């Protein structure tokens, strides 16, 4: 489902430092030249944002219950949101996926590659999105808050 409460033009209005937003499919929101082929905010997707300087995005609405919010992921790369309201060790946060993914990356270049015991991400954090490479179809269900 897509949120009809938060079209990009409204959601990002307060972010003067925003340059561009990109989703997993390559669609973009580029306010300076009036391009929005993403549509409305989808809380089941993660996004990449390029800013000229740090800023805070405030979103109003109901809190998501992560344990009741499945995210279906097909084979390949995805940008996933972290739906919990507190940090959690990545191995527990992604436990519902078992062995269906190969690697997870954050926006700082850290990785989680469980097959060879690498975890430089540590905890997943609220407000962050992560790249994940799925080996096959599975459903991500985060533990409850």
Feature annotation, model-predicted:
Residues 1-10:
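Single conserved hydrophobic/aromatic residue that forms the stacking wall/gate
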């Amino acid at each position: 489902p897509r949120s009809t409460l938060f079209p990009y033009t409204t959601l990002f209005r307060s972010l003067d430092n925003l340059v561009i937003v990109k989703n997993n499919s390559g669609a973009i929101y580029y306010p300076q030249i009036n391009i929005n082929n993403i549509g409305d905010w989808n809380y089941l997707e993660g996004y990449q944002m390029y800013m000229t300087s740090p800023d805070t995005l405030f979103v109003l609405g109901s809190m998501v219950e992560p344990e009741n919010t499945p995210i279906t992921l097909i084979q390949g790369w995805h940008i996933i949101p972290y739906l919990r309201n507190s940090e959690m060790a990545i191995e527990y946060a992604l436990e519902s996926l078992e062995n269906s993914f190969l690697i997870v990356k954050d926006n700082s270049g850290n990785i989680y590659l469980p097959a060879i015991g690498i975890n430089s991400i540590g905890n997943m954090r609220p407000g962050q999105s992560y790249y994940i490479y799925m080996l096959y179809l599975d459903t991500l269900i985060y533990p409850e808050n």
